[in-house]
Amino acid sequence: MDPDRQSDIAALDTTLTTVERVVNVDGLRGRIQQLESDASDPKLWDDQARAQKVTSDLSHAQNELRRVEELRSRLDDLPVLYELAAEEEGAGSSEAFAEADAELAKLREDIAGMEVRTLLSGEYDEREALVNIRSGAGGVDAADWAEMLMRMYIRWAEQHDYPVEVFDTSYAEEAGIKSATFAVHAPYAYGNLSVEQGTHRLVRISPFDNQSRRQTSFADVEVLPVVETTDHIDIPEGDVRVDVYRSSGPGGQSVNTTDSAVRLTHIPTGIVVTCQNEKSQLQNKVSAMRVLQAKLLERKRLEERAEMDALKGDGGSSWGNQMRSYVLHPYQMVKDLRTEYEVGNPAAVLDGDIDGFLEAGIRWRNQKVDDE
């Protein structure tokens, strides 16, 4: 094997060893054994919430271990591929070298993707994520754009086998949605998706314009960590006003004959949360309270960050402006305005292929932290 290829394999081995140490492979195996033991308890399903968490945690732990073990196995096999390629080249064939080089390139890409996991070391990065999407300027096109974004994130979660729980969807009159709130139930979902927070811009020929004019639409994405009991977000009962109403679907049609939808208003802050996707008023109230707790936790974090920025004499960083542009006409390109990462296949991106954007965003964010 030539020195360049040997050097590449050695560098990948160093990176993967770091990943294995951060992931704690031995600890992960022990956790899987414990979760398997918990899952085999016949009384587990007496508590459905706990049972769902145990089975979800077990699935994600098994998937993470499998990813690391597969990468290690492929890396260990790579020198053998090159040895076989050298033998075949002596017999007059160079195809085997091309195949080995292709595997080296793919392995480099896959290990880099797994390496991003080691960069998720923030206080809440391990948490599940709450995602809020709101249509912005652009009328019916903006509402349609908000729904397209919702589908993009749900497709991303589905591709990774991450369960999604939709808490609330407020439909627009003509098409699309005014807003939506959903949870992605997976370890590190918040760490990954938090870089998606900001304003997303769509440029396309409007399907709602009878003159087929180009339209620019905006939608805002907010990503929050799911609150845990250790966060101590206590909300006095008197601080919350509870309103109930009937759930509605697309075009304002009623989808429930009872007042099962719930709107919570946090009186001290004015934060409003709605939930209508559960069948009962009680379930909707519980879900809405979880979202309200997450919003209050984020508010607390932002206040603490503002205080630190003031002490440092720093204006702070803003995530609220345009962070990504999706152009479908006159050319096709999705470009992140912070990282410069871009993809010329918007259809794939809108179908959930956003890992490249997430990885670039996480690296960009960590570099900003290092520079401060």
From Swiss-Prot:
GO terms for molecular function: translation release factor activity, codon specific. PANTHER family: CLASS I PEPTIDE CHAIN RELEASE FACTOR (PTHR43116:SF3), PEPTIDE CHAIN RELEASE FACTOR 2 (PTHR43116). The modification N5-methylglutamine is found at Q253. This is Peptide chain release factor 2. The lineage of its organism: Bacteria, Bacillati, Actinomycetota, Actinomycetes, Mycobacteriales. SMART domains: PCRF (SM00937). One of its GO terms (cellular component) is cytoplasm. InterPro entries: PCRF, Pep_chain_release_fac_I, Pep_chain_release_fac_I_sf, PrfB. The gene is prfB. Methylated by PrmC. Methylation increases the termination efficiency of RF2. Belongs to the prokaryotic/mitochondrial release factor family. Peptide chain release factor 2 directs the termination of translation in response to the peptide chain termination codons UGA and UAA. It comes from the Bacteria. Keywords: Cytoplasm, Methylation, Protein biosynthesis. It is found in: Cytoplasm. It holds the Pfam family RF-1. Transmembrane segments: none annotated. Gene3D superfamilies: 3.30.160.20, 3.30.70.1660, Release factor.
